[in-house]
């Protein structure tokens, strides 16, 4: 009873298409793709910022030890 078969998935997909229409689903898919791309870009920017901050911290530490 708890298993989801291929037939059930196809029926659910057909109902979703009937309820929302293909244009709305296409728009939703594009919006979702844009959101994922933005999220990945933000994660990469955060990683680059953290690495840059860590590198500048190491350089500042080297300068302070030269005194």
Swiss-Prot record:
Extract the Pfam families matched here: TatA_B_E
Q: Which GO terms describe its cellular component?
A: TAT protein transport complex
Record's subcellular location: Cell inner membrane
- Give the residue spans that cross the bilayer: 4-21
Q: Does the keyword Transmembrane apply?
A: yes
Its topology with respect to the membrane?
Single-pass membrane protein
Q: Its domain of life?
A: Bacteria
> Which key words are in the record?
Cell inner membrane, Cell membrane, Membrane, Protein transport, Translocation, Transmembrane, Transmembrane helix, Transport
Instruction: Extract one GO BP annotation from the record.
Output: protein transport by the Tat complex
What GO molecular functions are on record for this protein?
A: protein transmembrane transporter activity
Query: Is Cell division among the key words of this record?
Result: no
Which InterPro entries is this protein grouped with?
Answer: TatA/B/E, TatA/E, TatE
Against NCBIfam families, the record matches this protein to:
PRK01614.1, PRK03625.1, tatAE
HAMAP family referenced in this protein's UniProt entry, alphabetically = TatA_E (MF_00236), TatE (MF_00903)
The job of this chain, per UniProt, is described as: Part of the twin-arginine translocation (Tat) system that transports large folded proteins containing a characteristic twin-arginine motif in their signal peptide across membranes. TatE shares overlapping functions with TatA.
Q: What family is this protein classified in? A: Belongs to the TatA/E family. TatE subfamily.
Protein name (database record): Probable Sec-independent protein translocase protein TatE
Q: Which organism is it from?
A: Citrobacter rodentium (strain ICC168)
């Amino acid at each position: 009873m708890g298993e989801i078969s291929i037939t059930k998935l196809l029926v659910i997909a057909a109902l979703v298409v009937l309820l929302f229409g293909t244009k709305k689903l296409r728009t939703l898919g594009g919006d979702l793709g844009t959101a994922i791309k933005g999220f990945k870009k933000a994660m990469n920017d955060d990683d680059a910022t953290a690495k840059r901050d860590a590198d500048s911290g190491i350089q500042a530490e080297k300068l302070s030890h030269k005194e």
